[in-house]
Amino acid sequence: MNKGSVDAITLSTVWHTFQSTCREMRHVLDRTAQNYLMAQLHDVAAGIWDAQARTLAVPAGPTSQLLGQKFSVRYILDKFGDNLYPGDVILNNDPYHGYCNHLPDWGFFRPIFYKDELLFFTLARGHQMDTGGSYPGGYFPDAYDIHAEGLCIPPIKVFEKGVERKDVFELVWNNVRWPEAVRVDNYALIAATKICENRLLALVKRYGKDTVLDCVEEMLSRTERAIRAEIARVPDGTYCGESASDDDGSEHDVPVWVRCEVTVRGDEMTVDFSKSDKQRKGFVNNTLPSTYSRAIAGSFLFFDSSLADFHNEGSMNPVKVVAPEGSVVNAKYPATVGGSPVSVGTQILEATVMALSQAMPHKAIASWGRHRGHYIFGTDPRTGERYVQTTFDSDGGAGAVWGFDGYEGACTFPTLGSVQRGNVEEVEIRFPWRILRYHMVKDLSGAGRWRGGSGMHWEALNVGSDGGMATGSSDGDQTHPPAAAGGMPGPLCKAYLQRDGEQIVVKPHRMYQIRKGDLLVKTSGGGSGVGNPRERDPEKVLNDVIDEFISLDVAEKIYRVAIDPITMEINWEKTRTLRGEPEKESVK
């Protein structure tokens, strides 16, 4: 590449066009998708790769859906070779034959040609409301193998040279429970890839192919240099982190452990998961690309935040990920993987972050409140039609970072906040459930010099039919989200069904029957803390008490700050005694 041929203005324009195009793709999906997960919760992702399967732009979206998708692009290149043409669109959701995350995340890839030369790939991926299988939604804890989890679609053309392959779509949509809704969402994803093609071809026509490709090389070179410089500032050594999920959905109440060793040598870093648990029978197993995505994402959190929107293949080159085959972080076919984005997937990110928090305590990051999802299946009496409902509403808040409290209401750690909560009105319009309570809860955040975001309480009444509920997308009843640098972990979660005066405990990774009139109650732990709680600014503790984030009792026993319950003022003398601080000399 002739570096002198790329001027700063052109480079900036090309680089930002890649980023803005991906965001535009997400906006298209927000406006056109129909299912609740995509349209309201934004469980979608979009990115751009080059003809060598190098990642060029992945500015926003769930970590598991993006950073490892170069494996999918490589698979497509290997499978189709020269049999790729302008107008092709390729569908894939198979974790083992196409390297998807789990079956509900359908991805549509479009090769982008300029004058018959393959230049780029784009991907739009979104969580489908159903993918067939034994239970609606895809989070089925009792599946025997991955084929029981749903329809496995290896990379297959659904458009060829611009012509829709209706027979392929007919086969696919005939194997899901809501074919018309899935059809609309599929076309929305395809439309997003067409937007990307239009924008990139316009860019190439404006600046010329060679100039754009020169800019790509410079983009990769700059991010690699920046990340190597960041790693070089970290003290050489090996740093360890670990985290556990409640169980695998098959062997109940037996934690599944992810263990990580991060080794820093000069300007390179290795993230090694070799000490993690072996592959499990249950559905929490991750495939290699999913593990890679989360390990890379966890690493990026500790680097210069101004790079966050611009990470690409260059950023990834200095980081090596080791995940032994046959483990929960690199499962072998036909292992079930349906619950992996929530359970074990979260722990991969947490273990990576815990290790790097030791390496860089001045950038320490605590984990977020655990996901408290569910998939409820029944019939809506208003329409007589079947429905499947899920939510992120009961998730706890974000974990603290060094220097800042965790965000209130953010969710969830594996998505880094890109997936959002829904709203009460939308839930009640779409589903036969009435939301009775939905609020933050006092004393449900992990304490620290900087505390985590608060936990959440959520209650919903079933005004529909009898049905079923899978809690495969839940975790955190037995295992805490890890804290950092002396902070305290977020509290455990709990849930139950209230039925005819009886409380039925609802645990993660189980199947339950739902009856009309049931009240589903969830209380989630919040994010974990960073730093010793006794070092928290007493004025911030007072504000937390006034704002009802923490109680007077927690303020005194955990934070060691004494507050008068009548005047709501700090008792400084008692506080210094509680904290073991010397008395201040009076001014004479």
Name each model feature, range by range.
Residues 1-86, 91-114, 118-588:
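Glycine/proline-enriched, intrinsically flexible loops and inter-domain linkers
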